[in-house]
From Swiss-Prot:
The protein's assembly and partners: Homotetramer.
Organism in which the protein naturally occurs: Klebsiella pneumoniae subsp. pneumoniae (strain ATCC 700721 / MGH 78578)
Gene: dapB
Any one annotated GO CC term: cytosol
Protein name: 4-hydroxy-tetrahydrodipicolinate reductase
First-level EC class: oxidoreductase
Family: Belongs to the DapB family.
Active site: H159, K163
Subcellular location: Cytoplasm
Positions with a binding annotation for NADP(+): R39
């Protein structure tokens, strides 16, 4: 392994996202796959991570604990579940390891734990690691500043049947981008469900609608609707590799950073636009 490479560990290696993260880590220049993890008791423990991901033998055996691979990685990439990610966060904070967190569904306490840990380690925490989605978020900020005060804003998202949280983290990030551009707190203006007799739409709110069906990788639309016209800004993902490549790119970007909380807009330098 070349000293210039950054070594990544992949949590949830046997999952759909984990396998593609392994592929991305093996393919990206400047990155080395240092470790792969699965839950204790998994039948995948001991298998070769590259073969598990369909990328050929990598010489990295899947392990069941971070302690077993403590000296084998610099940055952990975690797209698992909130409770597991927070356990990994505590370990990485204690041992000075960077993290790329793509897990969604954190409550306020979980988000605060991430902010606290970033005082000691470098973390990229994002709801979505695709370049396209992060450009979308920037476009939404611009659109909201121009027409957000007088249009009806709705966010519609669709994902595969196995997704366990709703609305998606990306949909919430879209809402936060719009609300922030309007100097609002999303908690004060979001409407997450409508059923029965709801009365007329409340001005200034941001509505959310969720679809869960089939194998949809991820589709997100923000609608700014006025009388006589509307603008729709949409992103559609057709492969999880776009997220995997973005996450591994983020791990590479963390090289040399000691601490701090960042997102994909930092990685892509979109905040300067």
């Amino acid at each position: 392994m070349h000293d210039a490479q950054i070594r990544v560990a992949i949590a949830g290696a046997g999952g759909r996202m984990g396998r593609q993260l392994i592929q991305a880590a093996l393919q990206m220049e400047g990155v080395a796959l240092g470790a792969a993890l699965e839950r204790e008791g998994s039948s995948l423990v001991g298998s070769d991570a590259g073969e598990l991901a369909g990328a050929g033998k990598a010489g990295v055996a899947v392990q069941s604990s971070l302690a077993a691979v403590k000296d084998d990685f610099d940055v952990l990439i975690d797209f698992t579940r909130p409770e597991g990610t927070l356990n990994h966060l505590a370990f990485c904070r204690e041992h000075g390891k960077g993290m790329v967190i793509g897990t969604t569904g954190f409550d306020d306490a979980g988000k605060q734990a991430i902010r606290d840990a970033a005082q000691d380690i470098a973390i990229v925490f994002a709801a979505n690691f695709s370049v396209g989605v992060n450009v979308l978020l920037k476009l939404l900020e611009k659109a909201a500043k121009v027409m957000g005060d007088y249009t009806d804003i709705e966010i519609i998202e669709a994902h595969h049947r196995h997704k366990v949280d709703a609305p998606s983290g990306t949909a919430l990030a879209m809402g936060e981008a719009i609300a922030g551009a309007l100097n609002k707190d999303l908690k004060d203006c979001a409407v997450y469900s409508r059923e029965g007799y709801t009365g007329e739409r409340v001005p200034g709110t941001i509505g959310f609608a969720t679809v869960r069906a089939g194998d949809i990788v991820g589709e997100h639309t923000a609608m700014f609707a006025d009388i006589g016209e509307r603008i729709e800004i949409t992103h559609k993902a057709s492969s999880r590799m776009t997220f995997a490549n973005g996450a591994v790119r983020s791990a590479l970007w963390l090289k040399g950073k000691k601490n701090g909380l960042f997102d994909m807009r930092d990685v892509l330098d979109l905040n300067s636009l």
